[in-house]
Amino acid sequence: MAKFRQMGSSIFFLFLIIISLCSAHKEAFSSTDLVQMECLRVPPLEFAEAAKTVVDAITKAVAIVSKFDKKAGKSRVSNAIVDCVDLLDSAAEELSWIISASQSPNGKDNSTGDVGSDLRTWISAALSNQDTCLDGFEGTNGIIKKIVAGGLSKVGTTVRNLLTMVHSPPSKPKPKPIKAQTMTKAHSGFSKFPSWVKPGDRKLLQTDNITVADAVVAADGTGNFTTISDAVLAAPDYSTKRYVIHVKRGVYVENVEIKKKKWNIMMVGDGIDATVITGNRSFIDGWTTFRSATFAVSGRGFIARDITFQNTAGPEKHQAVAIRSDTDLGVFYRCAMRGYQDTLYAHSMRQFFRECIITGTVDFIFGDATAVFQSCQIKAKQGLPNQKNSITAQGRKDPNEPTGFTIQFSNIAADTDLLLNLNTTATYLGRPWKLYSRTVFMQNYMSDAINPVGWLEWNGNFALDTLYYGEYMNSGPGASLDRRVKWPGYHVLNTSAEANNFTVSQLIQGNLWLPSTGITFIAGLVS
């Protein structure tokens, strides 16, 4: 608790510094800087006071949750309490990151340079953490959940208030569409990378042979470590340099967690289904969805390449996460995420997935991250009898959040086990997990595995008029719009101007932190 009280006063001081930068005098900056620095809707002091209110609310919420720690025993309630304390701790730290984006060299290595966008992302992540804390009490004692919900309500209210005080980023110039024939080449390699991926890291991502690694993991004892978890623990804390862990071919049965203090780790395997990290935690076996992940990463700037992450619990065990990602500015390249329900938990922050294989049944790409998926293989599997598949369940719960999923240039199809059951198992593009769920499919190939109505309700009319679901220029037998849902929140994007709002350059301000040209990372659309 002393830690949180100290954090309250320090964050208040940090906010005073950052807001002075946001609202700095116009003559001190170029016209480009001015767009970035004038990021607040309210006077600086009001913003600082609101930030302190958030930290105070978090401190009180932790005190309430912690009261149940020793009384809960070993149960889902106990797991939920542990989750809550960790999540609220992360929420408080996310508020302190604001200073790093503008003053600290460490922060510059892991931010976009757009103070307003960074603020909105990190405040939204704090809101997601509060919400996930409460979600963890699903299926537990109703009295405890009610008490915790009461303690968290002030956190949610104050974080939402803080979010309204930050300007939305201005629209960026529309990228020039790339011709379709160029797009074909884009699927063959990955030669252009985000600007924050350093030249040395680009070489590591491009080469098939890892000759230099800070740590080598090998199950057969030929490396520095035999487990991935030990290699992660040995990595330096808050590193501003890339720390490379080579995980050799093999099957690693362990639950790996890269905590928030482990920055800039790059984990390289020997290929999809050659290096496999596997586990079987599930909701049915007493784990919260958040804690069920086989692999979880919260440290900034994480990069993964050529690895399979899987959860083998099976469809009968319900929520069973293969990978949970809270890394900000993270990259997953040529990785596989295999599971059934809730395979990929893109929980919060900003991430890019390229040339990945993602398989599952119910809500198998879900969470409240701002994430772009390009050139991926997204495959629905056979689940329980009479069960409906839903590919996405995006978790945006406030209209001011910048979060959402864009799936672009990808192949949406059935996995081999579902091909024989297409007539009995319906697969949908997504359903609204939270009130302002936002997902757009653009320029993908959709097989006949996709049900003609396209999208699925969560619970009756819930969120149908507040969600934002969109489709633009998809192809294939599953892409026909003739029988799509008629919900108020569903949109057929008829023009490139509409679709451009969900491209890399607009959704995640990629013209600032991603390269705006290059045949393998496309900032805009394909003509």
Swiss-Prot record:
Which top-rank group of organisms is this from?
A: Eukaryota
Q: According to the UniProt record, where is the region Pectinesterase inhibitor 32?
A: 25-165
Name its cellular compartments.
Secreted, Cell wall
Q: Which reaction does it catalyse?
A: [(1->4)-alpha-D-galacturonosyl methyl ester](n) + n H2O = [(1->4)-alpha-D-galacturonosyl](n) + n methanol + n H(+)
Q: Write out the GO biological process terms.
A: cell wall modification; pectin catabolic process
Q: Which residues form the active site?
A: D342 (proton donor), D363 (nucleophile)
State which Enzyme Commission number(s) the record gives: 3.1.1.11
Instruction: Give site residues, Transition state stabilizer.
Output: Q341
| Signal sequence residues | 1-24
Per UniProt, substrate binds at T289, Q319, R431, W433
Task: Specify the enzyme's EC class, one word.
Answer: hydrolase
Q: Where does the UniProt entry place glycosylation sites?
A: N110, N209, N224, N280, N423, N494, N501
**Hey, what tissues is this thing expressed in?**
Expressed in siliques.
- What function does the entry list? Acts in the modification of cell walls via demethylesterification of cell wall pectin.
The UniProt record's further free-text remark is: The PMEI region may act as an autoinhibitory domain and prevent untimely PME activity during transport.
**Under which name does UniProt file this protein?**
Probable pectinesterase/pectinesterase inhibitor 32
Q: What is the primary gene name for this protein?
A: PME32
